[in-house]
Amino acid sequence: MLIVFTAFAFSEVEQINLLVIVSLSLFGVLIFSLVGMADPEVVNYLRQRFGKNLLSALVPLTVLYILTIGYLAMLDQLTTGQIIFPLIYLFLPALLLWWDRHNPQHINWRNLIAILVVWFFIELGLVPAASIPPDKGVSFFLLIALNGIIYSFLVIRGLDSMGYRLRPNLEDWKYACLYLGLFIAFFAVPIGFLTSFIGQTTDWHPLWQFPFILLGIFLFTGLPEEILFRGLIHNLLAGRLKKNQSELP
């Protein structure tokens, strides 16, 4: 995956310099950690290594924070606000989830605040508009947020599952292709044209780029929404509903 996106990024960048090389290396680190946490064995290792106490649990998030500050400094976007905001949206959810780790695994005010902090900071533009690689890449803070929230819920909170795994079987691929085709044909394209989100153009990307573009849309648009709404909110709400049903006479 990293090789594919590196080749695609190099094809889009007009000039290769040290900043581009460093940003692609950082991109590789973030993608590697993001994909790695889809493996249950990796998650179990992280729990054993960093889940013993609060200080050790915050070490990986501290690494993410240092990478964030370093990358912003390279882009010359480092301000007082940009030092404080990443500190809040990386560590506040982690602290809330640490104190919630022994409670039943259903939605409550701590879980909800942890999710909303990460979501609103990005949606409301409270984080810098930094891309990786610069100018023509993906949202840098989206990668940081995904790594942070997945780590916080799976390792610090100890959530049993959020449906995030990297071992799709034949049935997964069949349903994924079927529902993606139905969504594009009957919802995405018609609604996109009606709302002017999609428009006609005579400028086309080379055909070889389209598979990479679709993969990028899946990873950086579809995956975050699935993790947030289905992986976290849906599963935590399901836990709450099961609890309420078990308490009915």
Give the ranges of each region predicted by the language model.
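N-terminal signal-anchor module of multipass membrane proteins
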Residues: 1-38
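Alpha-helical transmembrane segments in multi-pass membrane proteins
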Residues: 17-27, 56-155
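Alpha-helical transmembrane segments of multipass membrane proteins
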Residues: 31, 64-68, 122, 183-187, ...
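C-terminal ends of transmembrane helices
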Residues: 34-47, 94-104, 159-163, 229
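Membrane-interfacial, low-structure loops and terminal tails that flank and connect transmembrane helices
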Residues: 40-58, 161-172, 238
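Small-residue-rich segments of transmembrane alpha-helices in multi-pass membrane proteins
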Residues: 59-62, 113-124, 172-185, 240-245
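Juxtamembrane helix-loop-helix connectors linking adjacent transmembrane helices
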Residues: 86, 105-109, 127-221, 239
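Membrane-interface helix/loop boundary segments of multi-pass membrane proteins
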Residues: 168-172, 227-249
